[in-house]
A protein has these predicted regions:
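Distinct, well-ordered alpha-helical segments
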Residues: 175-182, 204-210, 278-282
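A Trp-anchored, charged/polar loop motif used as the substrate-binding/catalytic surface
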Residues: 89-90, 144-153, 200
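Alpha-helical packing segments of well-folded alpha/beta enzyme cores
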Residues: 99, 147-151, 179, 241-244, ...
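Eukaryote-biased activation of long, low-complexity terminal tails and linkers
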Residues: 132-147, 158-163, 180, 318, ...
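N-terminal pre-core extensions flanking Radical SAM catalytic domains
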Residues: 1-139, 156-157, 337-390
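Core AdoMet radical
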Residues: 96-106, 117-146, 158-174, 186-203, ...
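Conserved C-terminal portion of the radical SAM core fold
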Residues: 194, 213-219, 239-389
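Leucine-rich repeat
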Residues: 150-156, 180-186, 209-211
Length: 390
């Protein structure tokens, strides 16, 4: 039975997400009963005995769509990527295999589609459509040595297979370096490490510790190249990011554990208005990296922009003007990336939700970006401004 025909989810049975809270994944609905890492002494005990998690597993294993997972159910109905369907899973007893740590909000970029929960730059910027005064000031919980000790103890005493680090920007966070340094050397040689980074910097001391793990995957987040990149990932510079991307991959390859599995790149692409016309460019960028680093393993993830926050619906490709969608170039390459890109556009055309509300949101936000950063999407596509401004 395929994942589209059942309600099973790998995350509920084998994953732990730490982001100050403790949950199976970042998409799950939270409430007042959601556990906090500061209140939990033993992560292994939480994994097996938390009542809400036990209830979730019971529902998912009996084909009941638990409402805590509505983000995935809705996205799947719209034929979009979901964490659940991206990972094949057959029912088996719970066993903690993946530890996913979102260490805080410390970041050096202010990406247009991101929010204050994941970027200290955006928190300071205080965008009017994202105002969230509930965020505490201690945004790097991972730097608390009590939390570091809990995590290191858990990893050293359990059979975790994979650890994922995410920010903010992990290369900037001291707590992450503390964790990957303090894990037993034998454990490191058995444990996969996935680091999600914007590649705006290259912290060699961070990667010096990272390459000691069994297999390292650099999850590099790039949605466009050149000047288009610069109006998506504000405060970033494409030439710097491109250079750092190459430096990271080169370092992973040169310093890999040999013999052992080859390091990997996972290219993270947030699919949105600002890059909907960049299919050919991104396909070429991805293929060029494969040619440059033939020994690396390669994969990509195309994330719908609504994964970055509910306030992003106006930038979802399903909610763009049909005139823009129908005018996009037909890319001839027959790669999997191109096919998925094309399928997303086709679905957006068939299920278009563009309306006056989304139009006004886009116009207002682009004006905001122009005022704050001196550039916006209309700098790149003045013809799109004409369409939105009618």
């Amino acid at each position: 039975m395929s994942m589209s025909e059942n309600t099973l989810c790998k995350a509920a049975f084998s994953d732990i997400l730490l982001d100050g809270d403790i949950t199976p994944c970042c998409y799950i609905k939270r409430n007042s009963n959601t556990s906090k890492i500061k209140d939990v002494d033993n992560l292994n005990d939480w994994f097996f005995n938390n009542k809400e998690l036990i209830s979730l597993r019971e529902n998912l294993s009996t084909n009941i769509k638990d409402n805590k997972c509505n983000v995935c159910w809705k996205a799947e109905a719209e034929k979009k990527w979901t964490l659940r369907t991206s990972q094949e899973y057959k029912l088996q007893p719970p066993k903690a295999k993946l530890l996913h740590i979102t260490g805080g909000r410390l970041c050096n970029l202010a990406c247009r589609m991101c929010g204050p929960s994941f970027s200290s730059m955006i928190q300071v910027e205080n965008r009017p459509w994202q105002n969230d005064n509930s965020l505490d000031h201690n945004y790097n919980w991972i730097d608390d040595q009590d939390n570091v000790a809990k995590i290191v103890q858990f990893i050293n005493n359990q059979d975790i297979e994979q650890m994922q680090l995410q920010g903010g920007e992990p290369q900037l966070m001291k707590g992450f370096v503390d964790i990957i340094t303090q894990i037993d050397s034998k454990k490191r040689s058995q444990l996969g490490l996935h680091v999600t980074t914007n590649a705006s910097i290259f912290n060699e001391k961070f990667w010096e510790q990272a390459v000691k793990f069994w297999r390292v995957t650099a999850g590099i987040s790039i949605d466009a190249t050149g000047s288009r990149y610069d109006v998506i990932r504000y405060d970033g510079d494409w030439k710097t990011t491109e250079k750092n991307c190459v430096n990271i991959l080169d370092y992973l390859w040169t310093n890999r554990i040999d013999p052992g599995p080859n390091p990997a790149l996972n290219l993270n692409i947030v699919f949105q208005l600002a890059n909907v016309d960049q299919c050919g460019v991104m396909n070429s960028f991805y293929e060029d990296l494969q040619k440059r680093f033939p020994g690396l393993a390669f994969q990509y993830t195309m994330l719908p922009i609504t994964d970055m926050g509910a306030s992003n619906k106006a930038w979802d490709i399903q909610n763009l003007p049909l005139e823009i969608l129908n005018s996009l170039p037909d890319i001839k390459e027959d790669t999997q990336l191109v096919k998925q890109w094309r399928q997303g556009i086709d679905y957006a055309i068939e299920n278009n939700g563009y309306n006056e509300n989304y139009k006004q949101q886009v116009l207002t936000r682009e004006e905001y970006f122009l005022n704050v950063y001196g550039k916006n999407l209309w700098t790149e596509r003045p013809d799109w401004f004409e369409i939105y401004n009618r």
